[in-house]
Amino acid sequence: MTNIRKTHPLIKIVNHSFIDLPTPSNISAWWNFGSLLGFCLIIQIVTGLFLAMHYTSDTMTAFSSVTHICRDVNYGWLIRYMHANGASMFFICLFLHVGRGLYYGSYTYLETWNIGVILLFAVMATAFMGYVLPWGQMSFWGATVITNLLSAIPYMGTTLVEWIWGGFSVDKATLTRFFAFHFVLPFIIAALAMIHLLFLHETGSNNPSGLISDSDKIPFHPYFSIKDLLGVLILLLIFMNLVLFTPDLLGDPDNYIPANPLNTPPHIKPEWYFLFAYAILRSIPNKLGGVVALVFSILILMLFPILHMSKQRSMMFRPLSQCFFWILVADLFTLTWIGGQPVEYPFITIGQVASILYFTIILIILPSISLLENKLLKW
């Protein structure tokens, strides 16, 4: 009798994806983030589902319904803070996952990489709409400022913004549709993640050396299933520490003030994971230019396969590229810091320098350094 694991139409798919999957034997902990992202997505969908049972998407009652969840629902405070901080953990894992892909040259798997970038956009859209739902001050003004950016699109901008708002300002119609999209997008993200995995399994995983590893592969289970489980436990430890001890560490105090269209907060800023892009947006004095730079700051990831000039796939044996990769990481930290600062000297100048450096490293320095390293190989 043959093993049901290998013959059953459904179980066979699971088997080829998570059990008998041939995996390079030398993949490091940097390869844990895919499974951690899956885990984060499950946490977000489950907690989100329970929050949706008690939340009302009406401007009059949205803020009160969140208060009700925290005060009156059994473990509502836990569900709410797990959902809010789960988004932060999601983005931490996402940034590390993308960074790993850039460092080790995983972007040469074109389909996997491009679907990954689409996934990043989808998660960012979901997080933005989720931030609007509690209907606090930062929710309202964040939604107003970010959606208003679309008015920079020539000819059709204003019409487009009013169409998204469902009126002449962010109001009940906007909140209702944002709730609807915020509810449905995670399921689309889950479907995209499956496609992402499907394309990855067509080629097999990359590994730290960037070399072909067909001659040295081991089954995913039990080796990497145990390794992933350790990653999940470490993530849970950090996550629950955040949720149970400092749940408001990454949030904005202004969001505990109910939305008031007549009172603008002194500093309007998005959640921390959007600050780098927000800093790039603000560093350009022109509105349309800022919006283009904002979109391109993420879309630039799709150019990496084209900009790859090196004869080696990974940066493991390329010290000069490594140096500039870490300068790029430091630059992203700088942009994140600047995005949370008021628009005044010296922050404006620092933001502009950091924005120029971001695009220069990616578009000019890294490809040039790669060509230099190719020359040094022959030397």
Swiss-Prot record:
GO biological process: mitochondrial electron transport, ubiquinol to cytochrome c
UniProt subcellular location: Mitochondrion inner membrane
One Gene Ontology cellular component annotation held by this UniProt entry: respiratory chain complex III
Superkingdom of origin organism: Eukaryota
Binding-site positions, heme b b566: 97, 196
More about this protein: Heme 1 (or BL or b562) is low-potential and absorbs at about 562 nm, and heme 2 (or BH or b566) is high-potential and absorbs at about 566 nm.
Protein name according to UniProt: Cytochrome b
Protein encoded by which gene: MT-CYB
